[in-house]
């Protein structure tokens, strides 16, 4: 959380070396304020929006341009999430931002912040690069993560308006009221208001306590003085971490206003040159001359006033003022370890042997396969391979373990064992608890052989020096030895290892106090000092801080500047400084505070002795912020991290770790912190950040197998949290872990760890198989196969079977046979019955895939025999099921049912487990299919419903999906049952929602809408409309405009059926507009026609169909030259106008339809068009034209009648012509001829009723006056344009 913003950046605001604001300046500001106008505008609140735009761009690293395909994929994914943004909300919650809206078309998010902490954390994640990686988690699916080249080549660049972000930050600062600033110029006190105003130097750090518009009350963090300061002279600290730290760890530094360090911008070590002569002011300081060489003990850090040096000429050791030496003459720290030594860096993240073993065990559990002992079921992967399985077994060793625990917990040795003092204050408790760790008193036989071993049960005479000689001799050693380590360690183990048999701590204190007196009397300097130190630590245990201070001060006086035991000197100075800080006694030892800070920060591998050292660490960090030294700030953050980890206060580590990560910049320094952050994020349940912090490190940072395996372990755990899979499910491998697993594999290859290499290859192959990518699986299994041969026969056999199985799943049967057949030959002379059975079974699957049914059956039978020999019921069941499936594919339903029923019986004998129940689901599906083929519908339904029950029992989504599909087909096509069909479609929809398959969900809602519509009740139409509208929303989210357009149309059709006419046009128009926007003319044409059909096929407002047909569909059809579509539309228009009695319009449309029918060359279409045209002419009383068109239709019929339907058509048309010519054209003789032809057609049909009707009609004509008016039987002459062969219309 130690972030800064992009534009404000890491501004180091140095004070000019030795330059103060002149006292001669006029009162008020010591420099012209016109240059500060922009800063004041930024600082004072302005009218601005609190929303921030976060834009993203998916780029290719190699091409250095936008990856258009991935950018579009991200946009589509975002579009799908725009209306259901729970997943996006959850992501930005992890990133400490509040999502306002998703703007997919603009490739951006709108976010906001309510607190300083939120904007601080978000800016940190933004600068660390975690935001862009988290967006990858959101945008891309497994196809991206499994493509290693694409992942390595892709980066998401995110951008924000940094000025706007800074303004939001400043606004929130002003809301809080209490914040920290730097003086942008020197400020002097006005002469007439002396004492009221604060005198400031440029860049001095100020704590603003309360403010007005022009002035504010403030306190200097350098001097501690309070007073008024002009607001225009202040600039808020731009780094949120600084604001947080100074607010939560208040205090002043007591530094001089002049900066005491210049020169190098790096931490120095090695040897340096003195710039001036220096005479010691205190005994612990080093005297030297200008130009003298000084060896740096530890580091020299810019920003600290002191460091520890050793004179090359005299060999003396002491404190050296930083200002007196040339920093550039030191050897700078390398970029690889800019702020700490290699040993210190390794202490931050080293997983250790225990963690490596635990992670390796987990990976082995994940890679475990039973392929060497359990037969494989044909086509079983269709049910198994689904990532969103809701219930699965968990590998051993993963139930209780947490990914970051061991290496952190290792640093908490003894930190939680506190012995409470009942009457101590909370503040004192915090200071004391680390030093007052409770300890047990071991018996002598429990102890190793210590250098000092004192029995305090015997009575000791204070006057007898002999009783105290052992401890005095032990402690009076000049300088440091390993025996003294227990004096300074965190657990104070010296007490428990060197003394025993005392009932109360007071006895121990009395013994040590007497020993101190003897040491003092005997002038035993080192024993005296160490005893004072021990008594001081014991005084802290008893909350006697003042007494402890006296002991520590006495010890320092006794040492009189001796540095032979640096651990003792550091412990004394730091403990005493902590007490000064806690008791607010800075004035008592200002120099000691600075020297204690130097001992703490400059000595590498410092071992913390007490919890109260945190006060000194924060003092040094505050000093680094005040003087603007990023190096000192980074070193202090590192020390804070180590101490807090030692105390087990992991929550408090995060801000310091994030700040250190921002300051580190270069690997491997940043890698150590990044690894630690990964574990901390995991502990805080921030899975996106935990994975991002690992992935951010990249493939180049996979150094060391233990670390790489631990990272893979952590990512695998957190990837399931990102996907929302319950923590109990570890049998699936998320594709999100693929890059990390590959890095781990590369690290193992460098170290030639073949066992772990093979394990990782098996896990990667499993991942690729889960995502239906057999080629990727084969790649890694080929490596595992080679490694298996090197490891042993068992591993080689297992790897061979896995590879063959992958080839079978990838339909590479020949390659599978190349492995399996030699493998079978090698097993013939062995007694490995089960293994031979496994190979026979896989051979059967291979032969079945090739269509070699006979050989497949023989292999399955041999596998069955081997299973029976071993008494393995499960393998027998699988063999029977495979035989049943083989015979089912060969259309031998009876045999198939027999085998499958035996398989079901065998499965019923097994103890219930998820694996066997899922196999049984597949067998029941086959048995149901066989029953359908045998027309045993009741049995089939029973099989399907039993299979679904097993899927529900184990919450196994894939099996439920397969069974539900079969049930939907069964109740829609095999044994129609609308209610049952709807029920199972609803369940299918629920499964799609659990699988987060939006496309499937949309299609199912569309199908459900149709099913409800078919019921045609008021309630079902309402439900249908709800389904269609929900599918519409999904299709719009997915950007599938064609389906969205059809959904708009479907909703409009339903509103028409529900007589909600005011909404019909709205939905139909939106459907057409959506289709037009898709730039697919064929879709627009289809929807124009279907929109017209809504009215054409209805009973209300049928005239509205004309505008969709004539104005919409016809122009599009002509533009696309879709003759048949245009013809169909004109036919509909003709029929519509006839029904509406608009015969003039009908004639226009029918004529056009007839012309188009001629152009199509389809005689059937031409016949229909001319028949409809004849009907229009008849309706318009144009009888001669009607007769001609009817005759044209007859000419289009085949010369020989081929079916009763054709004969019926002839009979009807000739009857129509007969009535027309007799009644309308008054031509009895032509009418007679037409009726005779109709009679002939009726005779061919064998329809006696029709024949009698026609004969009666002929009799009436012959007896009519019209017949007798023309006795010669001559017909009248009439035009025959069309029937005579003319093409003109």
UniProtKB/Swiss-Prot annotation:
Keyword field: Repeat, SH3 domain, TPR repeat
Any one GO BP annotation for this protein: peripheral nervous system myelin maintenance
Query: Per its UniProt record, what InterPro entries does this chain match?
Result: SH3-like_dom_sf, SH3_domain, SH3TC1/SH3TC2, TPR-like_helical_dom_sf, TPR_rpt
- Extract one GO cellular component term from the record: cytoplasmic vesicle
Task: List each copy of the SH3 domain by range.
Answer: 176-239, 267-330
In what ranges is there compositional bias, type Low complexity? Answer: 414-424
UniProt repeat feature TPR, residue ranges: 529-562, 758-791, 837-870, 1002-1038, 1085-1119, 1120-1153, 1167-1200, 1211-1245
Q: State whether keyword Repeat applies.
A: yes
* Record-linked Pfam families: SH3_1 (PF00018), SH3_2 (PF07653), TPR_8 (PF13181)
Q: Does the keyword Repeat apply?
A: yes
Q: Region Disordered: what ranges?
A: 393-442
Where are its TM segments located? none
What PANTHER family has UniProt attached to this entry?
SH3 DOMAIN AND TETRATRICOPEPTIDE REPEAT-CONTAINING PROTEIN 2, SH3 DOMAIN AND TETRATRICOPEPTIDE REPEATS CONTAINING PROTEIN
Q: What is this protein called?
A: SH3 domain and tetratricopeptide repeat-containing protein 2
Native source organism of the sequence = Mus musculus
Gene encoding this chain? Sh3tc2
């Amino acid at each position: 959380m130690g972030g800064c913003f992009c534009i404000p950046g890491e501004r180091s605001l140095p004070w000019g070396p030795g330059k103060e604001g002149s006292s001669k300046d006029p009162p008020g500001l010591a420099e012209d304020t016109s240059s500060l106008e922009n800063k004041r505008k930024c600082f004072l609140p302005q009218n601005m929006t609190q929303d921030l735009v976060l834009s993203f761009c998916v780029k290719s690293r190699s091409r250095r341009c936008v990856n258009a395909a991935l950018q579009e994929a991200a946009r589509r994914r975002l579009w799908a999430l725009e209306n259901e943004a729970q997943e996006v909300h959850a992501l930005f919650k992890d990133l400490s931002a509040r999502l306002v809206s998703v703007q997919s078309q603009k490739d951006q998010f709108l976010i906001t912040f309510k607190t300083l902490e939120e904007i601080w954390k978000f800016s940190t994640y933004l600068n660390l690069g975690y935001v862009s990686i988290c967006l990858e988690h959101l945008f891309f699916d497994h196809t991206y993560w499994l493509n290693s080249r694409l992942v390595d080549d892709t980066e998401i660049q995110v951008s924000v308006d940094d000025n706007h972000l800074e303004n939001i930050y400043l606004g929130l600062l002003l809301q809080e009221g209490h914040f920290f600033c730097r003086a942008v110029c020197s400020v002097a006190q006005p002469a007439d208001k002396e004492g009221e105003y604060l005198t400031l130097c440029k860049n001095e750090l100020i704590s603003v306590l309360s403010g007005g518009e022009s002035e504010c009350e403030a306190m200097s963090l350098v001097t501690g003085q309070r007073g008024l300061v002009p607001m225009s002279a202040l600039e808020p600290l731009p780094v949120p971490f600084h604001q947080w730290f100074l607010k939560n760890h208040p205090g002043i530094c007591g530094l001089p206003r002049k900066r005491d360090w210049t020169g190098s911008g790096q931490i120095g070590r090695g040897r340096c040159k003195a710039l001036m002569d220096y005479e010691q002011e205190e005994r612990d300081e080093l005297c030297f001359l200008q130009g003298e060489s000084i060896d740096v003990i530890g580091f020299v850090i810019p920003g600290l006033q002191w460091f520890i040096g050793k004179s090359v000429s005299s060999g003396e050791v002491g404190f050296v003022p930083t200002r007196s030496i040339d920093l550039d003459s030191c050897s700078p720290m390398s970029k690889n370890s800019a702020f700490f030594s290699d040993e210190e860096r390794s202490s931050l993240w080293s997983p250790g042997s225990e963690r490596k073993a635990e992670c390796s065990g987990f990976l082995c559990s994940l890679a475990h396969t039973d392929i060497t002992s359990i037969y494989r079921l044909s086509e079983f992967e269709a049910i198994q391979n689904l990532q969103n399985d809701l219930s699965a077994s968990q590998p051993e060793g993963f139930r209780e373990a947490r990914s970051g625990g061991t290496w952190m917990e290792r640093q908490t040795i003894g930190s939680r064992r506190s012995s409470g003092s009942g009457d101590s204050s909370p503040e004192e408790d915090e200071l004391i608890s680390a030093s007052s760790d409770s300890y047990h008193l071991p018996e002598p036989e429990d102890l190793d052989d210590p250098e000092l071993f004192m029995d305090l049960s015997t009575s000791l005479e204070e006057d007898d020096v002999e009783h105290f000689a052992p401890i005095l001799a032990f402690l009076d050693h000049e300088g440091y030895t390993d025996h003294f380590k227990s004096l300074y360690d965190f657990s104070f183990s010296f007490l428990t290892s060197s003394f025993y048999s005392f009932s109360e701590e007071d006895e121990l204190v009395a013994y040590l106090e007497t020993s101190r007196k003897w040491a003092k009397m005997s002038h035993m300097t080192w024993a005296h000092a160490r005893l004072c130190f021990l008594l001081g630590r014991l005084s802290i245990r008893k909350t006697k801080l003042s007494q402890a201070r006296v002991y520590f001060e006495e010890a320092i006086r006794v040492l009189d500047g001796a540095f032979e035991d640096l651990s003792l000197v550091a412990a004394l100075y730091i403990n005493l400084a902590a007490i000064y800080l806690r008791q607010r006694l800075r004035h008592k030892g200002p120099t000691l505070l600075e020297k204690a800070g130097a001992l703490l920060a400059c000595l590498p591998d410092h071992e913390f002795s007490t919890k109260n050292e945190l006060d000194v660490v924060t003092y040094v960090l505050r000093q680094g912020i005040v003087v603007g030294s990023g190096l000192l700030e980074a070193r202090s953050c590192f020390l804070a991290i180590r101490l807090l980890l030692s105390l087990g206060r992991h929550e408090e580590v995060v801000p310091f770790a994030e700040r250190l990560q921002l300051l580190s910049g270069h690997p491997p320094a940043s890698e150590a912190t990044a690894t630690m952050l990964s574990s901390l994020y995991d502990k805080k349940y921030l899975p996106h950040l935990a994975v991002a912090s690992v992935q951010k490190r990249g493939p180049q940072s996979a150094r060391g197998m233990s670390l790489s395996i631990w990272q893979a372990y952590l990512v695998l755990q957190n990837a399931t949290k990102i996907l929302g899979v319950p923590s109990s499910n570890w049998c699936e491998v998320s594709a999100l872990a693929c890059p990390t697993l590959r890095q781990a594999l590369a690290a193992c290859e460098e170290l030639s760890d073949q066992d772990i290499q093979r394990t990782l290859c098996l896990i990667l192959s499993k991942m690729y198989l889960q995502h239906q990518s057999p080629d990727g699986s084969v790649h890694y299994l080929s490596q595992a196969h080679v490694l298996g041969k090197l490891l042993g026969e068992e591993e080689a056999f297992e790897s061979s079977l896995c590879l063959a199985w992958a080839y079978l799943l990838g339909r590479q049967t020949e390659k599978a046979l190349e492995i399996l057949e030699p493998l079978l030959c090698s097993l013939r002379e062995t007694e490995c019955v089960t293994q031979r059975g496994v190979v026979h079974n896989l051979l059967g699957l291979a032969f079945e895939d090739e269509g070699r049914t006979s050989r497949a059956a023989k292999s399955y039978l041999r596998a069955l025999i081997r299973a029976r020999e071993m008494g393995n019921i499960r393998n027998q069941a699988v063999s029977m099921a495979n035989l049943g499936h083989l015979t089912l594919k060969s259309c031998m339903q009876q045999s198939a049912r027999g085998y499958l029923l035996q398989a079901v019986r065998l499965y019923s004998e097994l103890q219930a487990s998820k694996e066997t129940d899922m196999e049984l689901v597949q067998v029941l599906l086959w048995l149901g299919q066989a029953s359908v083929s045998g027309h045993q519908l009741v049995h089939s339904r029973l099989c399907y419903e039993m299979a679904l029950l097993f899927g529900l029992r184990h919450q196994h989504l894939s099996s439920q999906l397969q069974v539900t599909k079969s049930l939907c087909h069964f109740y829609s096509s095999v044994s129609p049952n609308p209610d049952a069909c709807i029920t199972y479609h609803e369940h299918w929809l629920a499964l799609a929602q659990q699988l987060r398959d939006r496309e499937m969900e949309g299609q199912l809602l569309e199908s459900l809408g149709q099913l409800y519509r078919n019921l045609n009740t008021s309630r079902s139409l309402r439900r249908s409309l709800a389904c269609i509208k929900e599918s519409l929303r999904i299709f719009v989210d997915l950007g599938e405009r064609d389906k969205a357009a059809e959904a708009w149309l479907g909703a409009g059709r339903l509103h028409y059926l529900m007589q909600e006419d005011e909404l019909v046009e709205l939905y139909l128009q939106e459907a057409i507009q959506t289709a037009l926007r898709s730039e697919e003319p064929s879709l627009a044409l289809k929807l124009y026609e279907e929109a017209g059909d809504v009215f054409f096929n209805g009973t209300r407002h049928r005239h509205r169909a004309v505008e969709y047909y004539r104005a919409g569909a016809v122009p599009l059809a002509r533009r696309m030259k879709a003759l048949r579509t245009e013809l169909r539309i004109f036919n509909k228009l003709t029929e519509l106008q006839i029904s509406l009695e608009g015969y003039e319009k009908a004639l226009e449309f029918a004529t056009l339809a007839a012309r188009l029918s001629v152009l199509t060359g389809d005689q059937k279409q031409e016949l229909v068009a001319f028949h409809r045209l004849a009907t229009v002419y008849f309706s318009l009383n144009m009888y001669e034209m009607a007769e001609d068109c009817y005759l044209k239709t007859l000419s289009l019929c085949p010369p020989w009648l081929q079916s009763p339907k054709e004969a019926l058509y002839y009979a009807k048309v000739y009857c129509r012509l007969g009535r027309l010519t007799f009644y309308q054209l008054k031509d009895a003789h032509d009418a007679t001829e037409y009726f005779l032809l109709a009679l002939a057609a009726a005779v061919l049909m064998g329809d006696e009723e029709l024949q009698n009707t026609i004969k009666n009609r002929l009799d009436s004509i012959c007896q009519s006056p019209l017949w007798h008016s023309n006795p010669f039987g001559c017909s009248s002459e009439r035009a025959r344009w069309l029937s005579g062969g003319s093409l003109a219309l």
